[in-house]
Amino acid sequence: ICAAIAAARHGSSVALIHSRPVLGGNSSSEIRVWTRGATGGGNLFAEEMGILGELKLANQYRNPEGNPILWDAILLDAVLMEPNITLYLNTFVSQVEASEGHIKTIQALEIISERKLTFSSTLFVDATGDGFVAASCGMEYIIGKEDSSTHQEANASIEFDPTTQGCTILMNTVKKDHIVPFIAPVFAYSLEHIERLLNNGGRIVCEKSNGCDFWWVEFGGQQDTINSIASIAFELKKLIFGIYNYIKNSGKFDAGNLDLSWVGSLPGKRESRRFKTEYMLTGNDVIAGKTFDDVAFYGGWYLDFHPSEGIYSKTDFCTQIPVSLYGIPLRCLYSSQFDNILLCGRILGATHVAFASTRIMDTCALSGQAAGTAAWFLVSQGKKTKALAEASVYRKIQSILEEDDMLLPGHFPTDSGEEITFIPSSVITSLPGKELGLLALDQDFFLALPVSLAKVSSLILDSEQKTDLQLEVSYSMLPSRNSYSKDKESFRKSLGQGRTTLSLMPFCKGEGYLLLVVKQHTGISVAICDQALSGVVCGYTASATYYNPLLDIDSFAGFGAQNLNNGYTRPYGGANIWLSSQEEVPSIKIVLPKKRKVSSLTFFFDCNLSEEMVSSRVQDVDPHHNIYLRYGVSPTLVRDFEIFAHIDGKEVLLRQVKDNFQRHVDVLVGPVATDLLFVRFLSTFGAKNTGVFEIRVH
């Protein structure tokens, strides 16, 4: 979806061919796996944006309950709104005609109509999950786990292992107001069989288990997840119905009123082919956060390993190693030996170890936008895939991706070259809210904020007695609560009794973001605030529930209008946001160096990039997911605003935007000739201060 939309928006004519009746792959209502990514891995301010961000924000606004059927509709809406996309659902690609590294045509069957279709194109993007198109044209691939000597990966198998991660079928249940009997189908596994599988390695059920709680009902990793998928699906059906029968009829659960509302028919597949591309991302790259000149998107989910035996394993159902945000190069999406095909999704060029992180859906979606943008650029310039290795080509693609709200770790934006002056009506001068309460340090606590802000800030604490605090400090461009730098420095600080402040200035020896970890200490609490200060967050290192620290701040100069054209559209090395005071109608005056034609303005608003926006949800989420499910639109997002221009001595209204729910907003206003624009921000979704990362004038 993201590849098709990216290419279409930039001007390509796109045929989107999908074998299923609904869009969304593993996140669709057919399979119902929720979308997760870098934020779910503990990275802060790291929620994936771009086209995926648009889809997620639309889902938060229109589908706050996380109904997977409505998620399907949001995806379909997004595709159908693009005039350059022709959508082919229920269409299975059956044959690829290719020679000498060039695809000529692909043949497909529209299953419900029996139409045989032939597609010819200048360029193809394979987002099939199994890589059918790429494999059919002869691109080399790997199935299984490389040995540790191949890429010197510490987490790799000692010897080559042909097994993979398995597949899963989920189920949904509902609670009724009456007893609902259940007689298991004959094919379901017996209560005895299921009991032998449960309660090992975290495989625990209860009457509240629902939806993605059953992700560990996994099978097929020791089989061929492509050619044996039908038998794998049947085994999973036997398991999932057997597990439901166990919950209902074993007598161990209060499940009399429980009713089965849905069971998947199509397995959610984790792994099959991985292709050998121009560069193979390794686990070492992921752990080190290696920088790439041709970085095109990013990941940040754990190195998340599942035993290939799946539910039949006696070991833990997964092993998750936290990683910080890492970039992924464009070279992972193509092989120069094939001149007109790009890859995206879980088939991209990565070792099995790196794949344990890159396979997650949010990362796959970002790879789609990168591939779609690159595809359009190559076609528009009459170039082949090998041109993507040229600096002049990938730098242009990078600038386009950044314009389209894609974060490229390690790539720093260039100056636009135009001297535009932004004059705000106000700048924040005090914390947005008031004290909410205290957060006890009964486990390790973290505070993340820009070093520039930390230099003028103190953390407010309460201590029952005089004591010493154990602290750890690290620095990064974008922090993670559970994967902080190996170069961390340890401190010991004395604390007085009662309400006290801890100056952060002594810890500011690095640049970018400061991550301060206060080790568990009974009798000490941190004061928290009821309103967010953009670019600042705190919480427990082991929890995805975050808080707003109550800070004593000497200066808010870092939240001025200088951020509106510094090139950064989210927290990265700093807060990078203008925050108004709590005035009724904050505004920005935009002064151009000379009168010129203005056609549009682009805004990047604050939607709270530290809280996950998943595609679907259930009412009760098992704590082992370690996820905070936000409801609806972030209070910090700008909702209503107006744009004016100074024309012939008068202030003229160009556009009113009402009920905006997007972060990246392009507003057409012209063309109009002017050298002075005004933007008035009429309301947010609840925040008292208006926040804007970037404004661009086109």
Locations of the language-model features?
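Beta1/beta-strand and adjacent pyrophosphate-binding region of the FAD-binding site
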Residues: I1
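Conserved N-terminal/central alpha/beta ligand/cofactor-binding core
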Residues: A6, S12-S13, I17-H102, I142, ...
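Short, well-ordered alpha-helix to beta-strand connector turns
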Residues: G11, S121-T122, T674
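Flavin (FAD/FMN)-binding glycine-rich loop and adjacent Rossmann-like elements that form
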Residues: N26, H102-T105, I112-L453, K466-G498, ...
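Aromatic, loop-rich ligand-recognition surfaces of beta-strand-rich domains
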Residues: D444-S483, G523-L533, T569-L653, D659-H698
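Short, conserved beta-strand segments of beta-strand-rich sandwich/propeller modules, principally
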Residues: E511-L515, L676-F678
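Short beta-strand elements
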Residues: C529-Y547
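Compositionally biased low-complexity segments at domain edges in trafficked proteins
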Residues: A542-S581
